């Protein structure tokens, strides 16, 4: 379904701000009720040395099994369906083995999709396939990141009109100049923007900080900069701490489905227990064959449409 206000366009952003909000598509938070989600394909997935996680997996000679990955992926699809979420997918490209991680090639906003600028050469083609997908769905492009490399896992909407942006520099996935470009755009839209550098070891900010519900976040306190933690607490956001080892295994990289429901990997034991104690409904597929390649459920999705909050 194309957006009622805007047809597909390659630039929906107004240079001076006040860009119109899309009528049908878009998300102004990470915790409004998720209605439509964009996933990458599993058919072309294989492990590459893309991160500290996947390098360790390959170094330890763990055997990759595509059939197992497909079964686990389908379990995740079933979880989304059970939660009432409509699933959309990128068309698989055999030259893009990390296309499964749909978080990074684009960023969905209330104003349209941002096309990012992937850092690793074997992922750059994902940006082009993302444009095709948004064209097919009739979702306008807000703009393209051009000032440097930037990946979607470093764009973290904390609450409506407020975003946390991470960057890692030349050794990582997102550059400071690109983060600044985003900051300028969103400040013109009258958003609050908090930019922070993170160690390239952690790949993206969504490894360690993810919103679960209004005023509730999962955070790895062992690896998150204290300034970020203080900033969140000053916003009266309650923090559920995720242990370092579970964080490295993508246990903090989870998806809020809205209405106190969360999708997380089966291995995320601590967060699962804490959320159940808070009264949350949990969807917890086994995704170990996928996560050992360096990405979790949050990495694998892009929220195309959430109920506004």
Map each language-model feature to its residues.
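The feature marks the mature, well-folded catalytic cores of soluble enzymes
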Residues: 1-309
């Amino acid at each position: 379904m194309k957006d009622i206000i805007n047809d597909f366009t390659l630039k929906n952003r107004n240079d001076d701000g006040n860009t119109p909000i899309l009528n049908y598509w878009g998300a102004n938070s990470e915790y409004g009720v998720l209605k439509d989600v964009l996933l990458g394909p599993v058919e072309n997935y294989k492990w590459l040395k893309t991160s500290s996680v996947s390098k360790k997996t390959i170094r330890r000679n763990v055997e990759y099994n595509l059939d197992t990955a497909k079964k686990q992926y389908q379990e995740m699809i079933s979880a989304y369906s059970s939660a009432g979420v409509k699933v959309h997918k990128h068309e698989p490209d055999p030259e893009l083995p990390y296309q499964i991680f749909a978080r990074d090639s684009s960023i969905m906003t209330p104003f349209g999709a941002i096309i990012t600028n992937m850092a690793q050469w074997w992922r750059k083609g994902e940006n082009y396939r993302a444009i095709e997908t948004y064209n097919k769905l009739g979702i306008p492009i807000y703009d393209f990141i051009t000032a440097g490399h930037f990946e979607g896992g470093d764009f973290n909407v904390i609450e409506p009109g407020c975003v946390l942006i991470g960057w890692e520099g030349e050794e990582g996935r997102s550059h400071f100049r690109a983060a600044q470009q985003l900051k300028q755009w969103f400040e013109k839209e009258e958003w609050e923007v908090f930019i922070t550098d993170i160690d390239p070891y952690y790949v993206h900010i969504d490894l360690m900080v993810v919103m679960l519900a209004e005023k509730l976040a999962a955070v790895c306190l062992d690896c998150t900069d204290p300034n970020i933690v203080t900033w969140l607490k000053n916003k009266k956001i309650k923090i559920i701490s995720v242990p370092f080892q579970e964080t490295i295994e993508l246990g903090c990289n989870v998806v809020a489905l809205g209405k106190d429901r969360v999708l997380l990997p089966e291995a995320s034991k601590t967060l699962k227990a804490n959320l159940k104690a808070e009264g949350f409904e949990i969807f917890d597929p086994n995704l170990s064959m996928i996560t050992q390649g360096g990405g979790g459920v949050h990495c694998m999705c892009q929220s195309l449409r959430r109920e506004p909050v």
